[in-house]
Structures are given as C-alpha cells and as structure tokens.
C-alpha cells in the first residue's frame, strides 16, 4: 500500500493505519499501531478520531486478547512465550472491566457511526468475565444498533453464545439454537465462495459456540451422548473442509481409512476412548438413530459414523475389557483394507501376541507409515482367549493348568498397553 506507507513515513501514523485498515492489511496495522493495543491506546485514538477505521481492529484485538488471557494455554507452554507465539497481549480483569465501561459509553454517546461494534465488544468481554446478565443486555442492544453487516452478524453470534450459559434445554430453546446454527451454516457457505475474505470466520464462530457453549450445555444437562455428538459434528465439518481444500482424494495413494485413525490428538477419539464398551455402543446406536428432537436430528446427521471405524473401536473396547465373545461380532466384520490403513498396521502386520514380552521385544521399522495387514489378529486373539479360558475351566491342577495359565498371561500382557501388538 504505497499511499499508506507514504503517510507513515511523513509521520502521519494514525492516517497510515486507517488506510491499512481500509485495505485489510492486518500485518501492517500491527506493525504501525502496535503500541496502541491497550485500553489506553484505544481511548487515545477515539479522542482523536471517534470513527477511525483503526478502532475496528483495536477493539477486535482487545476482545481477542481478553479471550486469550482467560482461555487455557497448552500445559507445557511458558506464559510469555505462548503470548508471543500467538501475538497476543495479556489483559487482566481490571482493565477488561474498564474497557466494558468505556465501550458502553461510546456505544451510547452518538459519536461513533458503529455503536454495534462497541456494544457487542462489551457483551463479549462481560460474557468472558462471567457477567451473564450484563452481557445479555449489551448483546440485545448491539443487535439493534447501527453497524456493518459483519458487526451485526457478530453481535447475533455473541448473543447465541451467551444464551448457552444459562438457558434450559427445552423445546423452545433447542428450536432457537437450531435456527441460529442453520443461519451460521448459511454464512459459512457464503464466505467459502468469496475469495476476497478470510473463508473461515463463521466456521471459527460456530466452533467456539459449539465447544464453549452448546457441548458443555448438553453435558451438564445430563445428555453426554448428545454432547459428544455435537463435538464430533465440528470435527467432521473441519475434516471435510480441509480434505476438500487440500484435494486429498485426488492424491496418489489416498485411502479414506487413513483419515480414520485413532490418535490422542483427536479430541473426539479421546472422549470415546474414555468410555466403556457399553457406553461407546450406546453412542454409536444414538448417532445412527433418528432422535425426535429437531436439533438432535441436525447434529446426528452431521456426525461421523463409518461402520468399519466403529466396529474396530467397539470390538477393541470389548476385547480390552476381557469380553471376548462380545468383541467377536464387531471385529469379524473388519476388512484388511481398513486394518492396513490404521496407524498400528505395522504392529498388526509384523508382531505376534503369543511371544513372551518379558523375554523378547519385537522391534519394527518405525519409518514405515502403513503396512499391509493380511490377518485379523484381534479376532484371532479373541477366539484363542475364549478357547484357552474354556480349557482352563476344565484343566486339572498342576502342569496342564499351569501351561494354559502361562499362555493366557503371555497374551494378556501382549494385548495390554505394555505389550507390542496394539
């Protein structure tokens, strides 16, 4: 932006920043106006120019910084390094409350062309600070205040988020949520087809409303299966989006089952892994059913429900609980194609569960990504365990029983988290 750069070099910092703001050059705005990323800086610019385009950036930045200060950072992250990494400023409660007071003043003093911006910012900060009623009042006021279409949309989304903290899940409220989610979906669809804008803003909005609002609301209302389904809905939408923009299906060697691996970085898998086999089966039955509630119907139709994936997960859960006969109906339907495209395929293909691990460690070439699996070892394991347990129940005391017990111990250890197989 040649004009903005010329303004900056001539000492007209605010004018230059306004020009960058108009053109949407966020990187340049941060460089030019970085010292104003605080309430004091916002007040200074507002006094100079109540309708400065730079204020749009600074207000948004301030609210984001309040959110980042309150949000949980990674456990192993140093505070200073983490905020530097995400380019955020720490905003504490006193300054945040002072901002709320200032934003409400600006939103009602008729000097700003866009009171919606200020009132919705006040609502979001109050929500983050736990001031529920004040946040709700400000959001309602913001929706009816003057602002750009994006500002008014943000105010509407903020109101939706605020309602999740204190509402009851009755028919009226779930109907409201369904309408708002469908509205967000329409906004997502529109922005995805507009190359001139960041194409994930409303997806980010929906993600926060789901994970910070709707998911915990269902959980605390005694509906854990719905809460998990809501979480999975967002995972699937995100995975579908990135699979499409990365053209994964057109890549050589692509296999859909490689997108269905179980790993600890997948928040939905982590939640499912904490369930018992019976609970996991109940969840699968729920997402493959047709709930009577319209909002729940909306959710389950958007969840991931591949039969191979869940057969593996449920069967393995039953196997882990020692319920081998119940595991077999699920494990026996697994295909070698699915098993060959799982992260543990190298172990299933090359390691044996009947080798005593206390004597032998089965090493593999860990550079392999996937390996061709030709035998369903989990199924074979379950059948062998049932046979050995049956033999043990009728074996005589002494060497025969000891031999069977040793074989059982070998297999139990190999099948555990300390073993080599899975």
Segments from the language model and where they lie:
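Extracytoplasmic/secretory-pathway proteins
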Residues: 1-422
């Amino acid at each position: 932006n040649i004009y903005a750069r010329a303004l900056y070099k001539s000492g007209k910092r605010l004018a230059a920043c306004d020009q960058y703001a108009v053109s949407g050059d966020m990187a340049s705005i941060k460089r030019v106006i970085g010292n104003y990323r605080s309430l004091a800086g916002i007040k200074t610019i507002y006094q100079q120019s109540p309708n400065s385009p730079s204020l749009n950036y600074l207000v948004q930045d301030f609210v984001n910084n309040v959110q980042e200060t309150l949000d949980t950072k990674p456990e192993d992250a140093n505070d200073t390094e983490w905020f530097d990494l995400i380019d955020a400023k720490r905003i504490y409660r006193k300054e945040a409350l002072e901002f709320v007071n200032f934003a409400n003043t600006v939103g009602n003093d008729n000097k700003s062309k866009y009171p919606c911006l200020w009132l919705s910012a006040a609502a979001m900060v109050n929500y983050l600070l736990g001031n529920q009623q004040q946040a709700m009042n400000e959001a309602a006021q913001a929706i009816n205040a003057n602002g750009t279409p994006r500002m008014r949309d943000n105010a509407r989304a903020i109101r939706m988020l605020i309602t999740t903290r204190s509402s009851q899940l009755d028919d009226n409220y779930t109907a409201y949520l369904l309408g708002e989610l469908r509205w967000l979906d329409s906004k997502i669809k529109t922005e995805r087809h507009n190359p001139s804008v960041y194409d994930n803003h409303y997806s980010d909005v929906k993600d926060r409303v789901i994970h910070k609002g709707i998911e915990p609301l269902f959980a605390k209302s005694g509906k854990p299966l719905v809460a998990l389904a809501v979480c999975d809905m967002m995972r699937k939408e995100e995975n579908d989006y990135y699979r499409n923009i990365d053209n994964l299906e057109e890549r050589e060697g692509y296999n859909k089952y490689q997108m269905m691996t179980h790993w600890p970085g997948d928040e939905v898998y982590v939640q499912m892994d904490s369930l018992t086999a019976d609970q996991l089966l109940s969840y699968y039955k729920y997402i493959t059913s047709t709930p009577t509630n319209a909002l729940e119907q909306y959710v389950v139709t958007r969840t991931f429900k591949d039969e191979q994936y869940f057969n593996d997960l449920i069967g393995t859960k039953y196997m882990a609980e020692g319920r081998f006969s119940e595991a077999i109906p699920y494990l026996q339907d697994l295909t070698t194609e699915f098993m060959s495209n799982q992260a543990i395929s190298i172990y299933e293909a090359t390691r044996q569960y009947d080798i005593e691990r206390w004597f032998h460690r089965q090493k593999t070439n860990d550079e392999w990504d996937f390996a061709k699996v030709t035998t369903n070892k989990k199924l074979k394991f379950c059948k062998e365990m049932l046979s050995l347990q049956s033999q043990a129940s009728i074996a005589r005391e002494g060497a025969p029983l000891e031999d069977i017990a040793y074989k059982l111990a070998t297999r139990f250890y190999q099948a555990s988290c300390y073993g080599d197989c899975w």
